[in-house]
């Protein structure tokens, strides 16, 4: 495993649309391992490959760690897609490792049904709700070049983007 640098707004690579993974290879498994290590170090509960400048449709998550009970449930999702979503919405305060120290309430479907391939190459479908639903939608957005600030008001988004652009010009690195 290797710790990888997480790219930060306004890095334009965050807006790239990630390419599908054709096959689960040892390289994809190693990338997932690197992503878990980088995600835990940050610390975070979800990471899309594009956030470490790898434009492939791979997500790692461990939402159990957020509960602070010392347990862990690392999961990888290859080529994840939402195949169904509830009409009922939920509001959750989101943050992002690529937009450090900024949080905002985002409204998303309360439950979603996802289809993905696991690291063993098995295609699966699963229902997600609560934090899992919020996190998987947030990470799938990354694979499509969408950031959580795209879901907030234009004024708030403009303010946060400007803040990160100014910091980048001054060479400030968020850690």
From Swiss-Prot:
Taxonomic superkingdom: Bacteria
Enzyme Commission number(s) from the entry: 3.5.1.88
Residues annotated as catalytic: 139
Cofactor binding mode and count: Binds 1 Fe(2+) ion.
Enzyme class: hydrolase
Cofactor: Fe(2+)
GO biological process, one term: translation
UniProt GO MF annotations: metal ion binding; peptide deformylase activity
Keyword line: Hydrolase, Iron, Metal-binding, Protein biosynthesis
InterPro entries (alphabetical): Peptide_deformylase, Peptide_deformylase_sf
SUPFAM superfamilies documented for this protein: Peptide deformylase (SSF56420)
Binding site for Fe cation: 96, 138, 142
Known catalytic reactions: N-terminal N-formyl-L-methionyl-[peptide] + H2O = N-terminal L-methionyl-[peptide] + formate
Pfam families, sorted: Pep_deformylase (PF01327)
NCBIfam families, alphabetized: pept_deformyl (TIGR00079), PRK00150.1-3 (NF001159)
Family from the record: Belongs to the polypeptide deformylase family.
Role summary: Removes the formyl group from the N-terminal Met of newly synthesized proteins. Requires at least a dipeptide for an efficient rate of reaction. N-terminal L-methionine is a prerequisite for activity but the enzyme has broad specificity at other positions.
Entry protein name: Peptide deformylase
Species the sequence originates in: Rhodopseudomonas palustris (strain HaA2)
